[in-house]
């Protein structure tokens, strides 16, 4: 290929795939430059390498550049000569990093990876136990390699005595047995993989036992993988060992005169010593025992070289630590993969402290002159030479050191339009590195624009940042067009602006837009903005005065439903007028006190209406305005501004009374200790909430002697500038309840606040929480980082690869409720998705959205306005793209608001979006200092609309007071309107007391039912007398003597066949009903007591209490993504149908039978101690929980299918994040879940050659079936050469038949092939990442040894489709600008476009970057893309 054809980068790296396989002995010799015969390294007197030693110059190349060992040839002129005296080739000393040597072994050894790493490949292949194999390899036992005519078995182990006895019995030469690696090699040589594979398949079809099947499949896998590769099994036994280049295992002379050496040299030295000794012994014809011992030691020393940690006794170094072997070099965080290949460092960068740069524009940063001078050095030198200030590089450098005047002028020129990258560690998401245009500043600190801080998560309390300089023109263009801070206005995780004002800016904007009564000039009317400005400047009106204003003709008032009219007269304040003057033309008039949320909203609005440029200007203006106004306001706060409400004491007294009341009730035995504890916590929580509410309103309406007063503390908190209600409550209200480190809540609250000061006791009880907060932070950061790493690894190769995969599947998205409140509206949950079907307005018949069209925020609002609850959209979880995802299934790129582009690395973005808040949230605990924010428990349901009551699936009994008590678990109250349509439905918990009857008319706000929030009652359904059964003290029940002197019976965790229950009998003693008692239930009746329906027999505590923060959340997220089975799982119904609970037990478990309408019966075994959620006669749906406990995602997948488990996992993840008020778009979770469900397990192989029970990628599986459909199975061969049952391609079949018929023979008959069937597997992310199709990616993640062993045996080929493999090999990643389409496209310029460009007035930016169009968008180019893989 001529130079002209190659593109601008080196084609040497342009290989498309990487293959790994076993090295043949001749390969190892071919790599080598000579045999290492001596264990010596270097001569301690001359410090020159010893000949034929481990550092020999003849083998590995010269120590000094262009100089042979003896010094006969010196200098470049002898390049390539081989010295006749010392045999060294004259060349560069760099070759000592490349040239390898070898060691010829006197006896073969087995590679430790193949027999010691579990599962043992050799053991599997030979069907031997690993322990037996080790006995043979380490010369303890003989193995029979050929029994000939004797009674011995093949592969039978014989001890020394047995071997001797057998030889005497059968005579020498009558059978063959051997030990050591030679024996293993003999056995491997005798394997015929093809027949073995057929035999195994036959055995597999015949066997019935599950374990046998598993073993056979494992063995078959290895046999087939070796058979299909070019490997021979005997290559696992080595004759020759490669020696790695000496500069990769250096020996360094220290100042003290000692040598520091790599551990590998010691390991090689042991091998060479033992090998040479073995040679001598063989030559001397030493006794067998001695030779055998030497061979064993050789095997052990080779094992230590390859993998020292797997040896029985690892070789120890000087300080009693195991030496680092070759395996340790590549695995783990410090190994080759993660330290050197994935963790490369930039060789020239600067770092310094950051300070705020309020005068910078959004795309700028301030760079200290020192840093700029150093970073831009080569560019400056080039310019100095061009301008003739310096002749040589050396003189130019001198000028730089002297800091001459010309240098500064040139520096100014060089930095224009040459962006720099700023990075702040930890870089948790892509906003951690952004590009800026540098401006030179004095001093040593980097100046950073305040608005980009949120993306970097930076503050100015001493944070440091690193500066990098993109060098090539491509890198500069990328930095400019893609990474510029102006392109990162919106967060890719949720599409909200990440560059929204905070702190002082918010405070300034809020202060200027606040209105106050009784100010100077109240009630004046103005016709234009200018008049208001004039009046304000003259002091006729104040900033907060209430005035009237006529809006300009082009502006309307901002309202939620966009109904304002243009040019209306509005009530506002001069401050708000000033704020709105700052907004660009085309925006509505925001007539409200601007809190941080409103400011963020205004930025989103601006972007949607006026585009990116206007938004950037708005951000800069908003910052200037905010800073200016907050300075002018002169806000600060004093202790007096922390207003404690006067009602505080009264609330505390009430709470204390309440606590006393509960204590008395407890003493009289009316409630359990647990109940009392919960009620006490509740009383204090109520008091605290009430005090807080009063405190906030007192601050809001703060009136001081001088009239109205803006309370600065309230202003900061309310505007969202700093400090939450939580913190103010602790300063001015009441600190409230504290948590112990266990998460339990201490029931005596802290009644004081920080302003009043804490007593010693109060201070002591708050140290718990504070300390836990700090400890948590330290521990959880690591966990969160690990989660991010696992997510990134599992999703790294998900890139947008095509426009539309053409799938017809999707997922249902709807409103998300939390309790009764709408947590996510429909518009929010479908925004940015692609609709699966077209949606038509039934009233007007207009198409709101077409099928496969993206739903914009506007369309989403229209769909919601139609009153739909759910719609179907495309999702990455059902995408059919064989690689990555397609644009339609992904939808909108959240950071730009338009359809995602091909080549976008959406997997990494998903991983960052989920992982980044994990780290954030782990760090959030300590700000509040452990004070508990316990939710007040709900204990009733109120209607939110009017309607008529319908009760569904409800079973109830009437108690003594005549109220209905609900018995069922899944009962619902539905409200219907006058047309009978359902408007609301509420799930009713067990044991709730109904306040309404069927058909009642209710109004909004009416109570439908009430319940005790702390316990679930177990109620009697019949009238009768109580008899206890299996309630045995000390075995199934414990008597709790409470402090009040009462005793309580509590059911405890029990083993064996006792099943505690309450039996209700009639007068004759006939049992009417048996009520099973679950663990932790307390019995509320006495033996022999008469009961009536609705009477409480026992109580179960409801799960409440404890503090929920994401520390509980992070492990939960990990648990979901790892698809772990929960500790104490629920049993779910396998089919729809009616429940019957059997009284007899199997193996100590109770049985629930579910009968479907079609008569299918399924038994469900329930471990004892579980609380049943269903009763006999209930109707259940498949997948519904029958007993308490967490659901198992694998069960959901098995019973109710993929969509159900997808929805479940997504919902669970979102619940954790939403409870922390972290918004993450669903699609990020969906991408990860799609990776977890990508593998299938072969159930029945059909006529394919897949292995039943093996796990594979669903697309490979689908392809295998599709290929099979192009074939035909021979049923009757006729006169053809086919045999019955073979599979042949259809074309060949037809052709052969045509030929046979032409000859007058009988054609073959064929039948359709049977496809394979498989079931979807749910894998945890770690497992999914390790099972990646790319062995390079998997090996660099975890379990390196295992992955590489497997890949080498199978001769795997890595196609380099993911990002990680390409990073490791130093290629461009196949995403973004490195994506196939962009790499292969050519740009054709349109003549007219070029002419237009040449006439347009050009900005400085465009001069340097002609690629940038007017709005920072690329200029239009027609690209002829060469398609095709």
Swiss-Prot record:
Skewed-composition ranges (Polar residues): 1419-1429
Residues engaged in binding Zn(2+) 1: 68, 70, 83, 86
UniProt GO MF annotations: DNA binding; DNA-directed RNA polymerase activity; magnesium ion binding; zinc ion binding
Highest taxon of the lineage: Bacteria
SMART domains membership: RPOLA_N (SM00663)
Keyword Lyase: no
Keyword Electron transport in record: no
Substrates-to-products reaction catalysed: RNA(n) + a ribonucleoside 5'-triphosphate = RNA(n+1) + diphosphate
GO CC annotations on file: DNA-directed RNA polymerase complex
One Pfam family, short name: RNA_pol_Rpb1_1
One GO term of the biological process aspect: DNA-templated transcription
Cofactor(s) listed: Mg(2+); Zn(2+)
Record note on cofactor: Binds 1 Mg(2+) ion per subunit.
Keywords assigned by UniProt, alphabetized: DNA-directed RNA polymerase, Magnesium, Metal-binding, Nucleotidyltransferase, Transcription, Transferase, Zinc
Positions of region (Disordered): 1407-1429
Ligand binding (Zn(2+) 2): 805, 879, 886, 889
EC number(s) given by UniProt: 2.7.7.6
Binding positions (Mg(2+)): 459, 461, 463
Function, as annotated: DNA-dependent RNA polymerase catalyzes the transcription of DNA into RNA using the four ribonucleoside triphosphates as substrates.
Record text on subunit structure and interactions: The RNAP catalytic core consists of 2 alpha, 1 beta, 1 beta' and 1 omega subunit. When a sigma factor is associated with the core the holoenzyme is formed, which can initiate transcription.
Family: Belongs to the RNA polymerase beta' chain family.
Protein name as it appears in the record: DNA-directed RNA polymerase subunit beta'
Organism of this sequence: Rhodopirellula baltica (strain DSM 10527 / NCIMB 13988 / SH1)
Organism taxonomic ancestry: Bacteria, Pseudomonadati, Planctomycetota, Planctomycetia, Pirellulales
């Amino acid at each position: 290929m001529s130079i002209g054809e190659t593109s601008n980068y080196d084609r040497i790296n342009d290989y498309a795939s990487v293959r790994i396989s076993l090295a043949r002995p001749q390969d190892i010799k071919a790599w080598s430059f000579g045999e290492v015969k001596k264990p010596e390294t270097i001569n301690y007197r001359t410090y020159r390498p010893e000949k034929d030693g481990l550092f020999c110059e003849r083998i590995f190349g010269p120590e000094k550049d262009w100089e042979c060992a003896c010094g006969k040839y010196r200098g470049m002129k002898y390049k390539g000569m081989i010295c006749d005296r010392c045999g060294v080739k004259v060349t560069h000393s760099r070759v000592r990093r490349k040239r390898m040597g070898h060691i010829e072994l006197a006896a073969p050894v087995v590679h430790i990876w193949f027999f010691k790493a579990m599962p043992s490949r050799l053991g599997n292949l030979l069907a031997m136990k690993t322990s037996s194999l080790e006995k043979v390899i380490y010369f303890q036992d003989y193995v029979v390699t050929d029994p000939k005519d004797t009674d011995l078995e093949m592969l039978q182990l014989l001890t020394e005595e047995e071997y001797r006895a057998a030889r005497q019995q059968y005579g020498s030469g009558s059978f063959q047995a051997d030990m050591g690696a030679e024996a293993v090699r003999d056995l491997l040589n005798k394997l015929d993989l093809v027949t073995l594979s057929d035999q195994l398949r036959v055995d597999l079809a015949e066997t019935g036992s599950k374990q046998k099947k598993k073993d056979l499949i494992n063995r078959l896998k290895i046999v087939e993988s070796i058979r299909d590769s070019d490997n021979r099994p005997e290559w696992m036994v080595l004759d020759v060992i490669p020696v790695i280049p000496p500069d990769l295992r250096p020996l360094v002379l220290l100042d003290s005169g000692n040598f520091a050496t790599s551990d590998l040299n010691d390991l090689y030295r042991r091998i060479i010593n033992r090998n040479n000794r073995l040679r001598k012994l063989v030559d001397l014809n030493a006794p067998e025992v001695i030779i055998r011992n030497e061979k064993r030691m050789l095997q052990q020393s080779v094992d230590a070289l390859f993998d020292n940690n797997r040896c029985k006794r690892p070789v120890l170094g000087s300080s009693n630590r195991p030496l680092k072997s070759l395996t340790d070099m590549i695995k783990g965080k410090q190994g080759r993969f993660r330290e050197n290949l994935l963790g490369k460092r930039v060789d020239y960068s600067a770092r310094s402290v950051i300070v705020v740069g309020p005068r910078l524009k959004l795309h700028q940063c301030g760079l200290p002159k020192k840093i700029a001078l150093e970073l831009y050095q080569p560019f400056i030198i080039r310019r100095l030479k061009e301008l003739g200030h310096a002749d040589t590089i050396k003189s130019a450098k001198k000028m730089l050191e002297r800091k001459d005047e010309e240098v500064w002028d040139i520096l100014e020129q060089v930095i224009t339009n040459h962006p720099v990258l700023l990075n702040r560690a930890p870089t948790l998401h892509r906003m951690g590195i952004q590009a800026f245009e540098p401006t030179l500043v004095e001093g040593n600190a980097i100046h950073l624009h305040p608005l980009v801080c949120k993306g970097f998560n930076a503050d100015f309390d001493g944070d440091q940042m690193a500066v990098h300089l993109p060098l090539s023109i491509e890198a500069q263009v990328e930095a400019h067009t893609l990474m510029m801070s102006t392109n990162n206005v919106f967060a890719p995780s949720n599409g909200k602006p990440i560059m929204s004002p905070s702190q002082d800016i918010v405070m300034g904007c809020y202060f200027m837009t606040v209105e106050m009564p009784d100010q100077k000039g109240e009630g004046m009317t103005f016709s234009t903005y200018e008049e208001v400005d004039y009046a304000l400047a003259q002091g006729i009106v104040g900033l907060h005065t209430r005035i009237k204003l006529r809006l300009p003709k082009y502006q309307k008032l901002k309202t939620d439903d966009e109904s304002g009219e243009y040019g209306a007269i509005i009530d506002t304040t001069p401050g708000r007028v000033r704020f709105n003057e700052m907004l660009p033309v085309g925006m509505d008039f925001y007539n409200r006190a601007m809190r941080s949320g409103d400011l963020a909203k205004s930025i989103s609005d601006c972007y949607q209406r006026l585009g990116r440029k206007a938004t950037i200007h708005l951000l800069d203006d908003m910052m200037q305005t905010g800073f200016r106004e907050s300075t002018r306001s002169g806000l600060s706060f004093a202790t007096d501004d922390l207003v404690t409400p006067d009602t505080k004491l009264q609330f505390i007294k009430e709470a204390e009374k309440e606590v006393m009341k509960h204590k008395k009730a407890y003493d009289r035995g009316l409630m359990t200790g647990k109940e009392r504890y919960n009620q006490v916590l509740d009383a204090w929580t109520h008091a605290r909430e009430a005090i807080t509410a009063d405190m906030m309103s007192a601050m809001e309406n703060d009136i001081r002697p001088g009239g109205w007063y803006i309370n600065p503390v309230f202003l900061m908190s309310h505007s969202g500038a700093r400090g939450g209600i939580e913190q103010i409550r602790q300063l001015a209200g009441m600190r409230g309840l504290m948590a112990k480190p266990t998460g339990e809540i201490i029931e005596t609250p802290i009644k004081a606040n920080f302003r009043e000061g804490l007593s010693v006791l109060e201070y002591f009880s708050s140290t718990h929480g504070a300390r836990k907060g700090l400890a948590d932070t330290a521990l959880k950061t690591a966990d969160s980082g690990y989660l991010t790493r696992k997510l990134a690894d599992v999703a790294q190769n998900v890139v947008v690869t095509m426009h539309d995969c053409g799938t017809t599947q999707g997922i249902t998205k709807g409103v998300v409720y939390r309790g009764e409140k709408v947590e996510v509206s429909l518009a929010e949950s479908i925004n940015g998705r692609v609709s699966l079907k077209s949606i038509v307005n039934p009233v007007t018949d207009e198409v709101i959205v077409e099928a496969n069209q993206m739903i914009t925020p506007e369309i989403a609002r229209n769909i919601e306005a139609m009153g739909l609850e759910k719609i179907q959209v495309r999702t990455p979880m059902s995408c059919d793209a064989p690689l990555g995802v397609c644009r339609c299934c992904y939808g909108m790129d959240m950071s730009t608001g338009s359809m995602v582009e091909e080549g976008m690395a959406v997997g990494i973005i998903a991983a960052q979006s989920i992982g980044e808040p994990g780290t954030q949230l782990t760090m959030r605990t300590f700000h509040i200092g452990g004070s508990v924010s316990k939710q007040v428990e709900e204990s009733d349901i109120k209607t939110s609309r009017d309607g008529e009551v319908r009760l569904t699936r409800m079973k109830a009994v009437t108690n003594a007071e005549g109220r209905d008590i609900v018995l069922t678990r899944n009962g619902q109250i539905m409200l219907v309107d006058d047309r009978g349509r359902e408007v609301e439905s509420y799930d009713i918990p067990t044991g709730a007391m109904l306040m309404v009857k069927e058909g009642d008319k209710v109004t909004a706000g009416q109570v439908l039912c009430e319940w005790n929030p702390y316990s679930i009652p177990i109620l009697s359904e019949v009238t009768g007398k109580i008899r206890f059964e299996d309630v045995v003290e000390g075995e199934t029940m414990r008597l709790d003597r409470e402090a009040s002197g009462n005793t309580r019976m509590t059911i405890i965790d029990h083993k064996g066949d006792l099943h505690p229950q309450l039996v209700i009998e009639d007068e004759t003693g006939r049992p009417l009903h048996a009520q099973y008692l679950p663990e932790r239930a307390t019995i509320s009746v006495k033996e022999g007591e008469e009961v009536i329906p609705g009477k409480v027999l026992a109580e179960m505590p409801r799960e409440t209490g404890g503090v929920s923060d994401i520390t509980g959340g992070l492990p939960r997220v990990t648990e979901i993504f790892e698809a772990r089975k929960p500790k104490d799982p629920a049993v779910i119904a396998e089919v729809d149908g009616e429940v019957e609970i059997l009284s007899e037990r199997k193996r100590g478990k109770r049985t629930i039978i579910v009968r479907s309408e079609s008569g299918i019966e399924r038994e469900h075994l329930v471990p004892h101690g579980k609380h049943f959620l269903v009763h006999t006669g209930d109707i259940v749906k498949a997948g519904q929980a029958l007993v308490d406990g967490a659901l198992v995602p694998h069960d959901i997948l098995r019973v109710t299918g993929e969509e159900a488990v997808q929805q479940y996992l997504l919902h669970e993840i979102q619940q954790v994040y939403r409870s922390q008020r972290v918004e993450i778009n669903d699609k990020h979770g969906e991408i990860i879940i799609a990776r977890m469900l990508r593998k299938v397990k072969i159930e029945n192989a059909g006529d394919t050659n897949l292995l039943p029970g093996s796990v594979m990628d669903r697309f490979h599986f689908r392809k295998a079936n599709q290929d099979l459909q192009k074939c035909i199975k021979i049923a009757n061969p006729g006169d053809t050469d086919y045999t019955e049952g073979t599979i042949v391609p259809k074309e060949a079949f037809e052709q052969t038949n045509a030929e046979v018929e032409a000859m007058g023979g009988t054609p073959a008959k064929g039948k359709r092939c049977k496809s394979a069937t498989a079931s979807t597997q749910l894998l945890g992310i770690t497992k999914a990442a390790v099972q990646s199709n790319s062995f390079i990616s998997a090996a660099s993640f975890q379990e390196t040894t295992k992955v590489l062993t497997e890949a080498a045996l199978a001769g795997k080929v890595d196609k380099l489709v993911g990002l990680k493999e390409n990073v490791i090999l130093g290629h461009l990643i196949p995403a973004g600008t490195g994506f196939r389409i962009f790499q292969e496209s050519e740009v054709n310029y349109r003549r007219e476009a070029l002419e237009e460009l040449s006439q347009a007035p050009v900005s400085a930016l465009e001069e340097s970057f002609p690629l940038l169009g007017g709005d920072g968008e690329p200029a239009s180019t027609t690209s002829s893309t060469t398609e095709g893989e």
